[in-house]
Amino acid sequence: MKWVTFISLLFLFSSAYSRGVFRRDAHKSEVAHRFKDLGEENFKALVLIAFAQYLQQCPFEDHVKLVNEVTEFAKTCVADESAENCDKSLHTLFGDKLCTVATLRETYGEMADCCAKQEPERNECFLQHKDDNPNLPRLVRPEVDVMCTAFHDNEETFLKKYLYEIARRHPYFYAPELLFFAKRYKAAFTECCQAADKAACLLPKLDELRDEGKASSAKQRLKCASLQKFGERAFKAWAVARLSQRFPKAEFAEVSKLVTDLTKVHTECCHGDLLECADDRADLAKYICENQDSISSKLKECCEKPLLEKSHCIAEVENDEMPADLPSLAADFVESKDVCKNYAEAKDVFLGMFLYEYARRHPDYSVVLLLRLAKTYETTLEKCCAAADPHECYAKVFDEFKPLVEEPQNLIKQNCELFEQLGEYKFQNALLVRYTKKVPQVSTPTLVEVSRNLGKVGSKCCKHPEAKRMPCAEDYLSVVLNQLCVLHEKTPVSDRVTKCCTESLVNRRPCFSALEVDETYVPKEFNAETFTFHADICTLSEKERQIKKQTALVELVKHKPKATKEQLKAVMDDFAAFVEKCCKADDKETCFAEEGKKLVAASQAALGL
C-alpha cells in the first residue's frame, strides 16, 4: 500500500469515524425532540421498557402510571420547549421519576442509595443494580381462549404487559428489537384468535417468538458485556469484523462509518438510553437504505419493509458476495516495507484496515477467530517494529495464524461428530459432565442451563456446510458462555470461571475449552434427598423431565468427579428405567418411595460413594 494511499484512507477513516451518519442540531428539549421523532406509541413503549428494565420488581400498574406521567410531561414540552424542566436531560428526567417510587428502599434495598447521587453517577448506579437473574415467578402461558379474550378485551394493555414481562426479565433486551417482537406478538393474536383452531395457529408462533426472543436477548447481552467490560474499542473491533464479512463490497471508510454509528446505538441501549437508541437505529437504517448501492446488493428487500421490520432485516441480512480478484493480503500487511511506518502513524486505523481486509475475505471464519488473528498481528507488530530488522521479524506472521485457525476447526469437527453420534439430549449430557468436572463450584441450575444451551450448538450449526459451521458455532458459543460469565459475576464461586471471563473477550471459549478437571475440588457430601423423586415427575413435559434428570447428573458428578463415563451411563440408565417404571405403576407415589431407595443405594454402590 502506497504511503499516500494510506494517508488518504486515514483521513477518510478519521472523518467518518468521528462524524458517523448522525448529524443533529441541538434541541432545547431532548424529551420533546425524541417524542416528535418516535411518535407517541413508540415513545410510551420505550419508556415502559426502560422503567421495567430498571425497576424489575415493580407491579405493572405502577409502571403504567410512571409512563403516563412522563408522556404527559413530554407533550407539555412538545407544545412549549421552554416550559419548566423541559430542558433537563433524559437521564435527569427518568432518574427523578424512578426516585419518586415510594417503595424503592423497601423493594430494592441499597439501590435506593442511587437517588442521593447526581447525574451521570446516578444512572451508572441504577445500571449496576440491573439483575440478569431476577427473582421473578416463572411465566406460565394461560389457555389460548383466556389469552384471546384478554387480547380482545383490551389489546393495548395486553401488549403493554408483554413488553413489561419480557423487559423486566431481560434488563438488557435490545429495546427497538423488543418493539419488533411486540409487533409480531400482536400479529399472531390478531390472526390466530379468529382461526378455526386457535391453538394450532397460535402456539407454534408463540414458541417461535419465545425461542427467538431468548436468543436475541442473549446476543444483546454479549454486546453490552463487550462494551461494559472491555470498552468501546473491543466492540468496534467486533463490528468491523462482522460488517466486513456482511458487506465485503463496501469501502473501508463506509464500513468505518457504519461501525461508529452501530457502536453509538448499542452504547445508548446498553446504557439505558432507549429513546436515543431507537431514534438513532432508525436513522442508521435510513442511511443504509439510502446508500445500499455502495454497501450491499442484499439490502433491497429489507429496505422495502416498514421501519421495525427493516431494521431487524438489515441486522440479519445474509453476507454479500465477495468481490472478485481481491489481491493478496501479504502485499500490504507483510511484504511492504512501510508496515511499521503505517502502523506507527495510526495504530487502530491500520489494524482496522487489516481486520476489514481479512474479514471480507473470510466469511467462513467466526468473528472471534478474526479478532484473535488481529490481536496476534498487533502483538507481532508491537514486538517487531521495535526490533533491529522489523521486516525480518514480522515476515512470517501469517504462519502464526495456522494453529489459531485449526483449533476451532478441529473442535467443531469433533463435537459435530459427537453430536451426530449421540443426538441433542445425550450430547448435552456429555457437555454437562465435561463442564461440571471443569468448574464444579458453579451452581447446579447454572451448569444445567448453560450446558443445555451449549448442547444446542449441534442442532443449530452442525447441519451447515463446512464454510458456515465455524461462524455459526463459535459465535453462538460466545453468546452462551457470556451467559455463564454474567450469572457467575453476580455470585462468583470459581477463580477459573472469573479468569476465563475477564482476561480476554475473544479467548473466552478457548480458555474454557482448555480447562482440565479441577483437581482442587472437594466432592460434595452425598445427600439422598437430592435423588428423591415423586410422582409429579410423570406429569412434566419432556423438556422439564430432561432438566430433572440432568440436574441429577450434575449432582452425581459433584459427588464423584472422577466417575467414569461408563459408571455415569449405568446410573443414568437405571434412573431412566426407574422413572419409566414408576410412571406406569398404579400407585406411583409408593413406587417412587420404595424403588427410589433401591436406586439411591444401587447408585451409591456403583459409584463407590
Swiss-Prot record:
One GO term describing the cellular component: nucleus
Entry-annotated residues carrying Phosphothreonine: 107, 444, 446
Residues in the signal sequence: 1-18
Positions annotated to bind Ca(2+) 1: 30, 268, 273, 276
Tissue and organ expression note: Plasma.
Effect of substituting residue 87 to N: In Malmo-95/Dalakarlia
Sequence positions bearing N6-succinyllysine: 229, 460, 543, 588
Site (Aspirin-acetylated lysine): 223
Alphabetical GO biological process terms: cellular response to calcium ion starvation; cellular response to starvation; negative regulation of mitochondrial depolarization
Predominant location category: secreted
Keyword Hydrolase: no
Propeptide position ranges: 19-24
Disulfide bonds: 77-86, 99-115, 114-125, 148-193, 192-201, 224-270, 269-277, 289-303, 302-313, 340-385, 384-393, 416-462, 461-472, 485-501, 500-511, 538-583, 582-591
InterPro entries reported for this sequence: ALB/AFP/VDB, Serum_albumin-like, Serum_albumin/AFP/Afamin, Serum_albumin_CS, Serum_albumin_N
Residues the record marks as carrying a glycan: 36, 75, 161, 186, 223, 249, 257, 300, 305, 337, 341-342, 347, 375, 402, 437, 463, 468, 518, 549, 558, 560, 569, 597
Effect of residue 389 to V: In Iowa city-1
Location(s) in or outside the cell: Secreted
Quaternary context: Interacts with FCGRT; this interaction regulates ALB homeostasis. Interacts with TASOR. In plasma, occurs in a covalently-linked complex with chromophore-bound alpha-1-microglobulin with molar ratio 1:2 and 1:1; this interaction does not prevent fatty acid binding to ALB.
Protein name: Albumin
Source lineage: Eukaryota, Metazoa, Chordata, Craniata, Vertebrata
Gene: ALB
